[in-house]
């Protein structure tokens, strides 16, 4: 089963219909405007089931933005097939301009979590096993945390 690809206008801040700093949005407000799976992953640091994300096999030209707030995260040029079960990118927009890295020692592992710098949504993790010809990094991102804006 593949998860749905959401449009920015259907979820997140745009649905709140108020001008607000994304970091000031209360969890109850996020819960009211995000589908359950998006809320679980983005706001509760969950993980979507591997190989089910709508962007795992998606390779159109464009950009990927945070589903919660619309901040630009990745360009399609940085996307590659990693076979890990989630969309993989070799670099983020502007060298983590809209991403925060956090040490994650949950589940008995040592990883680096990536979150949206604008709204603090959990996006996924970054690993050092990406393509050596680019950055050597692999951003492993949950599809449900992103929207896609096609390049014309």
Curated annotation (Swiss-Prot):
Function, in words: Methionine-sulfoxide reductase that specifically reduces methionine (R)-sulfoxide back to methionine. While in many cases, methionine oxidation is the result of random oxidation following oxidative stress, methionine oxidation is also a post-translational modification that takes place on specific residue.
One Pfam family from the record: SelR
Active site: 140
UniProt keyword Metal-binding, yes or no: yes
E.C. no: 1.8.4.12
Family label: Belongs to the MsrB Met sulfoxide reductase family.
Classification via Gene3D superfamilies: Peptide methionine sulfoxide reductase (2.170.150.20)
Protein name stated in the entry: Probable methionine-R-sulfoxide reductase B
Biological processes, Gene Ontology terms: protein repair; response to oxidative stress
């Amino acid at each position: 089963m593949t998860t749905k690809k959401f449009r920015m206008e259907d979820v997140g801040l745009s649905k709140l219909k108020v001008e607000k700093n994304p970091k000031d949005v209360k969890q109850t407000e996020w819960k009211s405007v995000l589908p359950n799976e998006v809320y679980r992953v983005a706001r509760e640091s969950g993980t979507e089931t591997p190989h089910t994300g709508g962007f795992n096999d998606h390779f159109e030209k464009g950009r990927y933005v945070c589903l919660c707030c619309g901040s630009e995260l990745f360009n399609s040029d940085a996307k590659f097939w990693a076979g890990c079960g989630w969309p993989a990118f070799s670099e983020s927009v502007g060298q983590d301009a809209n991403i925060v890295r956090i040490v994650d020692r949950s589940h008995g592992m040592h990883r680096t979590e990536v979150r949206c710098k604008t709204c603090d949504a959990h996006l996924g993790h970054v690993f050092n096993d990406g393509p050596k010809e680019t950055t050597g990094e692999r951003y492993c991102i949950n599809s449900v945390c992103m929207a896609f804006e096609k390049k014309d």
